[in-house]
Amino acid sequence: MSAMKTDGQAFSKELTVLNKQGIHARPAARFVKTANQFAADIFVEKDGEKINGKSIIGLMMLAAGPGSKFTVHASGTDAQKALLEIEALVKRKFDEE
């Protein structure tokens, strides 16, 4: 996991998928549920593709398997809090294991 990068009220963090099955339906739903708790625009970028972090389908389309690296970008009032909570969720393996 890399250090959080800031740009005004925008924050970015590279994370690694740690759970055994990657980001499938349940982890994507948990990610979106967490993201939706905050007043922030959240985008996820993997292999040059950038999707809305509040979209379950978008997250699943990234095909982020175990060990995959992806970057979360957050901007807005709660951007830093959102990014910290998302990082915690990923580190907890999406509460699956």
Residue ranges and their predicted role:
Residues 7-9, 63-64:
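Solvent-exposed alpha-helices and their adjacent loops that cap or buttress functional pockets
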Residues 65-97:
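C-terminal structural segments of small proteins and small subunits
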Residues 8-14, 69-71:
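Intrinsic-disorder/low-complexity, polar/charged segments enriched in Ser/Thr/Lys/Arg/Asp/Glu/Gln
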Residues 2-5, 33, 81-85:
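Long, contiguous binding/interaction regions
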Residues 16-57, 61-65:
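Compact, glycine-rich, soluble single-domain proteins
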Residues 3-5, 11, 56:
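N-terminal loops that bind phosphate or other acidic moieties
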Residues 2, 16, 55, 75-77:
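Intrinsic disorder
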